[in-house]
């Protein structure tokens, strides 16, 4: 399918290295970004990292606001503060929730956004999309893509291993997401970008290679993962949608998040969904599952405390989460019996 217009939204600069948060002011000013600046962060992150960043901005006008979750209430709070202080640039310092709030507010008020992630837990650190609770759906919405990403590997490598593994899980999901995209292009005439899809798959390949590296050198492994997450976000920016990074595995994850909220990390659910959807696609799901085990990702629902019936129910409703997004689940989805069989044969449930 040919598109009349295709807009590619990419970062202007990506800074990646060790102890580079000390250079943040230099980076910001080199991009000709002006104050007042608003730093969106979290309570824990502020104590460890954000206060250090604020010291670097002592000659600039800087405001700080703390958020806990990516909800529309938090978005409204941050937006009100940004407008009241006539903010020109928003800097997100934290994990996925904080980054999502920061870039969604930047999108709503038309200001530049800088991403400074503190955990490599998902590819939202780069993408022009955000997941915000309270908008009536658990899927991603358009947001402001970062003009710059500042990825300090020492900061990212200090994140809990579970968050690092979740980032691997989220990135592995590109394997089935791209296959779903190809299916939608073939059966529904959707736009499909071969180069963009290849970039997403390369991200998944590098994420899978992290297991061996992380065990030997955490910082080296986290650098590979961070670059994979950035590449995945870039793929979404090039595609103009989340298609190369989000397919049936994400629909399953979103279904779990609705049925059994706040019990698992997003990347952990995507990882489970990837095993299940790989099975349906006829992809070598056993190889994917084996790689996940090596990383330390959960491969069974009970490892996350999720009841079997929730897994089955999620499989039966996943196709309804985003009806306009065609995937291997089709328009009708799975019956309870089919869902139970798939979940058992893949070992997700006993």
From Swiss-Prot:
Record pathway: Membrane lipid metabolism; glycerophospholipid metabolism
Reactions catalysed, as given in the entry: sn-glycerol 1-phosphate + NAD(+) = dihydroxyacetone phosphate + NADH + H(+); sn-glycerol 1-phosphate + NADP(+) = dihydroxyacetone phosphate + NADPH + H(+)
Keywords in alphabetical order: Cytoplasm, Lipid biosynthesis, Lipid metabolism, Metal-binding, NAD, NADP, Oxidoreductase, Phospholipid biosynthesis, Phospholipid metabolism, Zinc
Any one GO cellular component localisation term in the record: cytoplasm
Annotated S-S bridges: none
Keyword NADP included in the entry's annotation: yes
Binding site for Zn(2+): 170, 250, 266
Superkingdom of this protein's organism: Archaea
Co-factor binding comment: Binds 1 zinc ion per subunit.
Predominant location: cytoplasm
InterPro entries to which the protein is assigned, alphabetical: G1P_dehydrogenase_arc, G1PDH, Glycerol_DH
Family from the record: Belongs to the glycerol-1-phosphate dehydrogenase family.
NCBIfam families to which the protein is assigned, alphabetical: PRK00843.1
Subunit and partners: Homodimer.
This protein's name: Glycerol-1-phosphate dehydrogenase [NAD(P)+]
Gene expressing this chain: egsA
């Amino acid at each position: 399918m040919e598109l009349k217009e295709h807009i590619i939204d990419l970062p202007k600069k990506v800074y990646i290295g060790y102890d580079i948060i000390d250079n943040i002011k230099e980076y910001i000013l080199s991009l000709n970004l002006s104050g007042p600046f608003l730093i969106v962060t979290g309570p824990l992150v502020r104590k460890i990292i954000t206060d250090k960043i604020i010291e670097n901005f002592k000659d600039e006008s800087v405001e700080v606001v703390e958020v806990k979750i990516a909800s529309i209430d938090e978005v409204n709070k941050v937006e009100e503060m940004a407008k009241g202080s006539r903010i020109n640039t928003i800097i997100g310092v934290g994990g996925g929730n904080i980054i999502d709030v920061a870039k969604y507010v930047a999108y709503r008020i038309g200001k530049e956004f800088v991403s400074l992630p503190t955990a490599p837990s998902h590819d939202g650190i780069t993408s022009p999309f955000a997941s915000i609770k309270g908008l009536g759906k658990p899927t991603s919405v358009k947001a402001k893509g970062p003009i710059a990403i500042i990825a300090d590997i020492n900061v990212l490598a200090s994140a809990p291993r579970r968050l690092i593994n979740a980032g691997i899980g989220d990135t592995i999901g590109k394997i089935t997401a791209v296959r779903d995209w190809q299916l939608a292009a073939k059966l529904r005439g959707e736009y499909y970008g071969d180069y963009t899809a290849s970039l997403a798959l390369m991200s998944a390949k590098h994420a899978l290679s992290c297991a061996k590296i992380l065990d030997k050198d955490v910082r080296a492994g986290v650098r590979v993962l961070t670059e994979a997450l950035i590449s995945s976000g870039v793929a979404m920016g090039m595609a103009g949608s989340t298609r190369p990074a989000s397919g049936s595995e994400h629909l399953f994850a979103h279904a779990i998040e609705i049925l059994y909220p706040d019990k698992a990390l997003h990347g952990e659910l995507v990882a489970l969904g990837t095993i299940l959807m790989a099975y349906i696609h006829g992809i070598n799901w056993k190889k994917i599952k084996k790689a996940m085990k090596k990383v330390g990702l959960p491969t069974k629902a009970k490892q996350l405390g999720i009841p079997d019936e929730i897994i089955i129910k999620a499989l039966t409703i996943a196709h309804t989460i985003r009806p306009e997004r065609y995937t291997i689940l089709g328009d009708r989805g799975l019956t309870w019996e089919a869902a139970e069989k798939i979940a058992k044969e893949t070992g997700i449930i006993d």
